Amino acid sequence: MSKDPGRILIFDTTLRDGEQSPGASLNLEEKLAIAHQLARLGVDVIEAGFPFASPGDFKAVNKISEVVGGENGPIICGLARASTSDIKACYEAIIPAPKKRIHTFIATSDIHLKHKLRKSRKDVLSIVPEMVSYAKSLVDDIEFSCEDASRSDPEFLYEVIQLAITSGATTINIPDTVGFTTPSEFGKLIFDINKNVPNIDEAVISVHGHNDLGLAVANFLEAAKNGARQLECTINGIGERAGNASLEELVMALHVRKSFFNSFFGRSSDSPTPLTAIRTEEITKTSRLVSNLTGMNVQPNKAIVGANAFAHESGIHQDGVLKNRLTYEIIDAKTVGLNDNKISLGKLSGRSAVRARLEEMGYDLSREDLNDAFARFKDLADRKREITDRDLEAIVSEQVQLPESRFQLSHVQVSCGSTSKPTATVTILNTETHTEDTSVAIGTGPVDAVCEAINELAKVPNELIEFSVKSVTEGIDALGEVTIRIRNKNKIYSGHSADTDVVVAAANAFLNALNRLIFSEKKECIHPQFDNLENSEKKVFSNPKN
């Protein structure tokens, strides 16, 4: 049997695999904000990125290692392909972390070996011990992944795993890379690994999976029943294609059905000991932060964190819930931190009162960020009678989200109606030339007119592919959250903003997306799975401090 920590370890890969969602690119400040919140959430491991990908990724992993990792905090992990240059860059990035891990991988399925790596099984059996041993010479905590394990020949898989453990791997990850397997198959795969790998008791078995068939969470729970003790997941289930296994769904399944799962951990069914170290009351806030910063909206009927997760429309259901919530709810909304507390703050409230409430909510802002957030709070308080925690979350998350900006909104005004053509006048500041320019444009609606005017000024080719707006809270004076996604050269960029005036929010969201596009074009990135290893070997990003 594999090494058993006595509970499930939660390995969060939102900042690595989650960020590979189209349009979900994050800047350094956003990654730090998410990493800090993941630490508050109580995850065991944060996979902070792929350091070899770009100088920006290296810097983000390095900074997270420096300020988020701690003796009592999460392990900070970096991803590296099975190459010396990748592993070296990863090690240099995670050096500041008191608890650090190198996560290296190579494909083991025949389809990947033939068509992607163009290597033989013999080649893999030579590479694995060499690269794992090299990583082990740098740090003690080594995770090794057999990419596309669920489509690999089992006998070859056992051989690779045994070699990796012999060479120093302390965690063995079994990925369902393309979301191909079913729960019973995945559970059997983990069972068979435990049965057929002689030294498996020297490593923790981890699982990683994608949701292409909608089975990722079910697969993971079956894997846990069969000995997997680390689950690799993302907030809101974001990730490439159909996404990854959802952290909140996994954690709450283990929380709500603890009496069922306890026996698979050698416990009595009524054992009160939690199966994970997650602070469930932080789930909703973490979900909202990731959604706001990535621009990836959560579907309303998403389990645990969707807007409708605790809503009841049917009269019969409403009646039952009013009499006893347990009739139709298996989770108390407060367990996941869902509340809409109205706070006694208004336009006369001072900076210290706002800071105190933000600290109660778990936000620790710098003096500069607090000043900016307070200014936005005062502006909102002048326009909105009641301020909720949700309003404060929107203010803070937007403050964190602001990307590097070449263009900033100075002024926007629209004219529209049933008998007039929607017209927008927009003035933007170019931060490079320190000049302001104004344009007037006509569109099919006020938002379209605003975007047309901005495009005339910015002159950055793009195609607007998504515009969405939602109310942060109830009431006609509620903040409106706008998310805009644009495309350029087959890449997608997101912008997000909130304001009581949705036209102003739309203008800022569009400019945020444009700024991301502009600055991302200056950064060359490597994809850990799709880019050819040999062609990228020459490109090494070293620690800027060295």
Swiss-Prot record:
GO BP, sorted A to Z: L-leucine biosynthetic process
Annotated SUPFAM superfamilies: 2-isopropylmalate synthase LeuA, allosteric (dimerisation) domain, Aldolase
Protein's name in the database: 2-isopropylmalate synthase
Intracellular or extracellular location(s): Cytoplasm
Functional description taken from the UniProt entry: Catalyzes the condensation of the acetyl group of acetyl-CoA with 3-methyl-2-oxobutanoate (2-ketoisovalerate) to form 3-carboxy-3-hydroxy-4-methylpentanoate (2-isopropylmalate).
Pfam family name, one: HMGL-like
Cofactors required: Mn(2+)
Stretches the record annotates as Regulatory domain: 408-546
Keyword terms of this UniProt record: Amino-acid biosynthesis, Branched-chain amino acid biosynthesis, Cytoplasm, Leucine biosynthesis, Manganese, Metal-binding, Transferase
Species name: Prochlorococcus marinus (strain MIT 9515)
